[in-house]
Amino acid sequence: MTQEVDQQILLQQLKSDYRQILLSYFTTDKALKEKIDKFINAVFCANIPVPEIIEIHMELIDEFSKQLRLEGRGDETLMDYRLTLIDILAHLCEAYRGAIFK
């Protein structure tokens, strides 16, 4: 049972980290690369499957969309955040590729 709890805690932390990446992705945040690297390292070391990352992304985008609608704003700009997901998955592929050739 504790392994399941640990997994849930890890997933919540990853979701929180990914939220920070999303919020700063289109800004000039100089720490963004470090945030992405930290996230990728955590995902890689924990052996989190790619569909889980996609699910985290979709959940957060859905939350953002609901918030924008509550504020009376459109959510068209959220489509741009697909780039964030593509970037994260590309970094993860590089981590896997690097691990294979070591």
Swiss-Prot record:
Gene3D superfamilies: KaiA/RbsU domain. GO terms for biological process: circadian rhythm. The keyword Cell cycle does not apply. Keywords: Biological rhythms. Changing residue 69 to A: Abolishes the interaction with KaiC. The keyword Transferase does not apply. Residues 1-102 form the KaiA C-terminal domain. Pfam families: KaiA. PROSITE patterns: KAIA_C. Homodimer. The KaiABC complex composition changes during the circadian cycle to control KaiC phosphorylation. Complexes KaiC(6), KaiA(2-4):KaiC(6), KaiB(6):KaiC(6) and KaiC(6):KaiB(6):KaiA(12) are among the most important forms, many form cooperatively. KaiA and CikA bind to the same region of the KaiB(fs) form and therefore compete. Belongs to the KaiA family. Lacks the N-terminal pseudoreceiver domain (PsR) domain found in some cyanobacteria (also called KaiA N-terminal domain). The KaiA C-terminal domain mediates interaction with KaiC, homodimerization, and is responsible for the clock oscillation function. Key component of the KaiABC oscillator complex, which constitutes the main circadian regulator in cyanobacteria. Complex composition changes during the circadian cycle to control KaiC phosphorylation. KaiA stimulates KaiC autophosphorylation, while KaiB sequesters KaiA, leading to KaiC autodephosphorylation. KaiA binding to the KaiC CII domain during the subjective day yields KaiA(2-4):KaiC(6) complexes which stimulate KaiC autophosphorylation. This is Circadian clock oscillator protein KaiA. The gene is kaiA.
